[in-house]
Design a protein with these regions (language model features):
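RecB-family 4Fe-4S metal-dependent nuclease core
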Residues: 1-126
Length: 126
């Protein structure tokens, strides 16, 4: 990441999928980073031995400092993607994708337009 270290602590995987946490806890960072880690962990071309993958957020501006705490924490425990990593994350992803493609759910933009400040698709919603 090249922006400011905005990482916040979360208590559960469910918080990642709660839209109200995107701005306050930057759960989008968790979503993206854990998703990448799961893809690396599950890809036999990248991880033949199925070694655990530890997703981190590395902030360039903090690279020299001793205080570069890059670990993603859920309930104060570092996230490690392996055989024992909970299926709750996969279920959350599945639910999001299912909702996107559910034709019975009409599209409605978020009521919290602060989330849209830098979105390149803003003009399609408002």
């Amino acid at each position: 990441k090249t922006g400011r270290n905005k990482k916040s602590s979360i208590k559960s995987i469910a918080e990642i999928f709660d839209p109200k946490n995107i701005l306050s806890k930057h759960t989008d960072y968790y979503l993206q980073t854990i998703l990448y880690a799961k893809m690396v962990w599950g890809n036999p071309n990248l991880n033949k031995e199925k070694l655990p993958v530890k997703p981190i957020l590395f902030y360039v501006q903090n690279a020299k400092g001793a205080e570069n705490d890059s670990d993603l924490l859920i309930d104060k425990t570092p996230v490690v993607v392996d055989d024992h990593f909970t299926d709750e994350f996969a279920e959350g992803i599945h639910k999001v994708v299912e909702d996107i493609f559910d034709e019975s759910l009409p599209f409605s933009p978020t009521q919290d337009t602060k989330q849209c400040t830098n979105c390149p698709f803003y003009e399609y919603c408002y």
